[in-house]
């Protein structure tokens, strides 16, 4: 397991402060799409999305991940120009917020270049580096890149057979890292993602997450994107917007396995969960004078009269 969640070089590149091991960097999600599977925010305008980002930052987010194409498989891919028009105004505005570190969720090199020019510091690739030029775009823009495991193309729902899904994830990501390095990305700028749900059945995803420790053999920080995923729904028999408790359980397991970044919808719940968990485990010191503010002690009943 890594001594630091992120190396000082990557912390400096992204402008992030050091975090203790019990509290990974939290990546809040802002969808610049009309069709996200789990977006209940009603965030349709640039202003709406900036306000959501502001709230996520106030709730404890370290990074804001902006995406212009949803992962819904029964919808066509978004044209490059349309995706750029969705994400660039949002990224430009969020990047101006105090303390905001912006990531762009895209697999298209042209979108990545436009997003980096607009202020994104991370390229979050969910295609498994389908196009090596995406890594070149990150290198040119001095941005970090997240490389995710998947054996399916974007927008494709596919569950290929695996002889050993854990070994496949490790080998795939090792190859993706080497390809990124060949495009000029410094090793210190690479983050890996096991890709829960992507080209994996719920059982296969669970198998990979149980073995998350093995990904430390790659020598790179791990991003866990388990928020509201189908494997959580399969275990709990709940729809996307009802999976927060299951998401927090997955987050806890990820922290135990040494993840560096957690990509989440509900940042406030995750931050509170991690704080209480660390206090009870002894990882977070608790002042003897700790007390609850009186106005937060109970719900005030408001008369209907």
Q: Which residue stretches match the model-derived regions?
A:
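Phosphate/pyrophosphate-binding loops at sites that engage ATP/ADP/AMP, CoA/4′-phosphopantetheine
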Residues: 57-58, 176-189
